[in-house]
């Protein structure tokens, strides 16, 4: 099934790229971004639609948890709407920031109402009872995961490789705990096929259709499996990218000074002269090492 999903995506992506080029479904580059990205304007976007839809298909075949599939669907709708508006308006805006945040919060709220999770958290082996505060915590985890992957999607291949380098070790970790969340692998191989066409120079971008969905799935899975804190160890790069934005905005508002040349962090490295390939390679290796160290610490390997 995993191999079939990979091959199906590998076969369909060239067709999708041709279709999107013909329909002029292309990326509009935001003006605030690095000048280096100007040549990417017009590259087909919304490529995440394929690995998400095949993820649904194989997820249903593998009898994936219904709540995970529902979460995937809700965040897919948000990402798709954002990309659709951007393409329709012929600019990079799509949904406004507050609109996207409201929709993500609503999606997470719906998920929590349906999941009705226990209100305790596993803090690396210690159980902490949070009571009603847990729902706010879980809301932040799901919305934060979705946004973190979205922020990471700024260079050719970056978000895809980060997802693969974290989701596969995370799957092994959950398997060791007796939890089967095969949707992580199903999406992972779909993303691998996508990366054949997304690595620099990218022939297609995943868009928010892909990145928001991937992050939403990760957050939902972590809440369902009570591994919210562990998730951070497998996705250190998205966490760092998010922190870089928070620090940059906070520093500028309070001290009128910027910490980085530009945020998220990958743009800072671009502006100090690193190539996209180098940034993607270094970030991916860092995330993979963090994931493998986590597996070693918790006795999954070694």
UniProtKB/Swiss-Prot annotation:
Keyword annotations from UniProtKB, A to Z: Cell cycle, Cell division, Cell inner membrane, Cell membrane, Cell shape, Cell wall biogenesis/degradation, Magnesium, Membrane, Metal-binding, Peptidoglycan synthesis, Transferase, Transmembrane, Transmembrane helix
Main localization (coarse): membrane
Lipid bilayer topology: Multi-pass membrane protein
CDD domains to which the protein is assigned, alphabetical: GT_MraY (cd06852)
Enzyme nomenclature, EC number: 2.7.8.13
Catalytic activity: UDP-N-acetyl-alpha-D-muramoyl-L-alanyl-gamma-D-glutamyl-meso-2,6-diaminopimeloyl-D-alanyl-D-alanine + di-trans,octa-cis-undecaprenyl phosphate = di-trans,octa-cis-undecaprenyl diphospho-N-acetyl-alpha-D-muramoyl-L-alanyl-D-glutamyl-meso-2,6-diaminopimeloyl-D-alanyl-D-alanine + UMP
Subcellular location: Cell inner membrane
GO terms, biological process: cell division; cell wall macromolecule biosynthetic process; cell wall organization; peptidoglycan biosynthetic process; regulation of cell shape
Cellular component aspect of the GO annotation: plasma membrane
InterPro entries given in the database record: Glycosyl_transferase_4, PNAcMuramoyl-5peptid_Trfase, PNAcMuramoyl-5peptid_Trfase_CS
Protein's pathway: Cell wall biogenesis; peptidoglycan biosynthesis
Cofactors required: Mg(2+)
GO terms for MF: metal ion binding; phospho-N-acetylmuramoyl-pentapeptide-transferase activity; phosphotransferase activity, for other substituted phosphate groups; UDP-N-acetylmuramoyl-L-alanyl-D-glutamyl-meso-2,6-diaminopimelyl-D-alanyl-D-alanine:undecaprenyl-phosphate transferase activity
UniProt key word tRNA processing: no
Similarity comment text for this entry: Belongs to the glycosyltransferase 4 family. MraY subfamily.
Biological role stated in the UniProt entry: Catalyzes the initial step of the lipid cycle reactions in the biosynthesis of the cell wall peptidoglycan: transfers peptidoglycan precursor phospho-MurNAc-pentapeptide from UDP-MurNAc-pentapeptide onto the lipid carrier undecaprenyl phosphate, yielding undecaprenyl-pyrophosphoryl-MurNAc-pentapeptide, known as lipid I.
Name listed for the protein in its UniProt record: Phospho-N-acetylmuramoyl-pentapeptide-transferase
Organism, scientific name: Thermotoga maritima (strain ATCC 43589 / DSM 3109 / JCM 10099 / NBRC 100826 / MSB8)
Lineage: Bacteria, Thermotogati, Thermotogota, Thermotogae, Thermotogales
Gene: mraY
């Amino acid at each position: 099934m995993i191999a079939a999903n990979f091959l199906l995506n590998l076969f369909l992506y060239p067709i999708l790229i041709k279709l999107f080029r013909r329909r002029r479904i292309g990326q509009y580059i935001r003006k605030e971004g690095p000048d280096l990205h100007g040549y990417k304007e017009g590259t087909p976007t919304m490529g995440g639609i394929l690995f998400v839809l095949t993820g649904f298909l194989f997820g249903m075949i593998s009898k994936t948890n219904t709540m995970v599939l529902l979460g995937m669907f809700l965040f897919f709708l948000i990402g798709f709407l954002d990309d659709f508006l951007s393409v329709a308006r012929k600019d990079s805006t799509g949904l406004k920031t507050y609109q996207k945040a409201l929709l993500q919060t609503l999606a997470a709220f719906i998920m929590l109402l349906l999941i009705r999770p226990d209100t305790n958290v596993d803090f690396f082996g210690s159980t902490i009872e949070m009571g009603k505060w847990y729902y706010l915590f879980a809301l932040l985890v799901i919305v934060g995961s979705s946004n973190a992957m979205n922020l990471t999607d700024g260079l050719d291949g970056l978000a895809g490789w980060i997802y693969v380098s974290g989701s596969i070790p995370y799957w092994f970790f959950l398997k060791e705990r007796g939890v089967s969340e095969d949707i992580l692998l199903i999406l992972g191989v779909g993303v691998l096929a996508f990366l054949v066409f997304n690595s620099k120079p990218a022939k297609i971008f995943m868009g928010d259709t892909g990145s928001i969905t991937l992050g939403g799935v990760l957050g939902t899975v972590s809440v369902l499996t009570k591994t919210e804190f562990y998730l951070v160890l497998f996705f250190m790069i998205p966490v760092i990218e998010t922190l870089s934005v928070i620090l940059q905005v906070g520093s500028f508002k309070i001290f009128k000074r910027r910490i980085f040349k530009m945020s998220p962090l990958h743009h800072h490295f671009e502006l100090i002269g690193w190539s996209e390939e180098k940034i993607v390679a270094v970030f991916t290796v860092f995330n993979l090492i963090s994931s493998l160290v986590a597996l070693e610490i918790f006795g999954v390997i070694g």
